[in-house]
């Protein structure tokens, strides 16, 4: 259960990152509307974080062995609202940009990075995958129960600004799917198991004398 909650927190962070990156690419390309479409959901993610741990940006709920506290019912309600409402807005955002001729003219061929150069420079994440490298640590070296989830790895071809934009968009869909799966798995825990948020270990150890 704790691993699934960790995955939810991490994938919300991925979406929060990608939506700000892609909406700002739109602003820099002369299209402000997309920024307004997505930022309201970045705010909703921060509201979830605030409900979970009291912090909007730095999720300080994590501890060795679990969390500092359990998720509240309000946090789950806000999460469910995000899962239900975000897909429609993300789809609208894609309709605004993905095949927009002006946006494509301003991003295709801009700042291309080859797969070889991306590896040599130590690129990771969507920038690496946009360059055509099919690698995601969540799949190739799974941690925190990622092996329990079904999702794809979006990969680009040219590593230009447009590819990076598309990969991030596709990753948001994959993250949304992971969050949905994790939310369903968390709901399967009943009774006392539904209250587990930390390993059964002492809060601290005293050193040997």
Predicted regions and their residues:
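Metal/cofactor-centered catalytic core regions of large enzymes
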Residues: 1-209
């Amino acid at each position: 259960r704790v691993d699934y909650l960790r995955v939810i927190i991490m994938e919300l962070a991925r979406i929060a990152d990608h939506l700000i990156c892609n909406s700002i690419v739109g602003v820099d390309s002369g299209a402000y509307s997309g920024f307004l479409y997505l930022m309201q959901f970045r705010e909703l993610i921060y509201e979830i974080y605030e409900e979970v741990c009291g912090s909007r940006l730095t999720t300080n709920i994590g501890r060795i062995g679990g969390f500092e506290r359990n998720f509240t019912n309000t946090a789950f309600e806000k999460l469910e609202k995000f899962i239900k409402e975000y897909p429609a807005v993300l789809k609208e955002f894609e309709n605004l940009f993905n095949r927009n001729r002006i946006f494509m003219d301003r991003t295709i061929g801009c700042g291309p990075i080859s797969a070889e150069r991306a590896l040599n420079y130590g690129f990771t994440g969507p920038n690496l995958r946009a360059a055509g490298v099919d690698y995601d640590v969540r799949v190739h070296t799974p941690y925190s129960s990622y092996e329990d989830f079904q999702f794809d790895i979006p990969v680009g071809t040219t590593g230009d600004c447009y590819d990076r934009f598309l990969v991030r968009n596709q990753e948001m869909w994959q993250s949304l799917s992971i969050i949905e799966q994790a939310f369903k798995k968390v709901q399967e825990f009943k009774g006392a198991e539904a209250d587990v948020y930390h390993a059964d270990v002492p809060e601290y150890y005293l050193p040997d004398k």
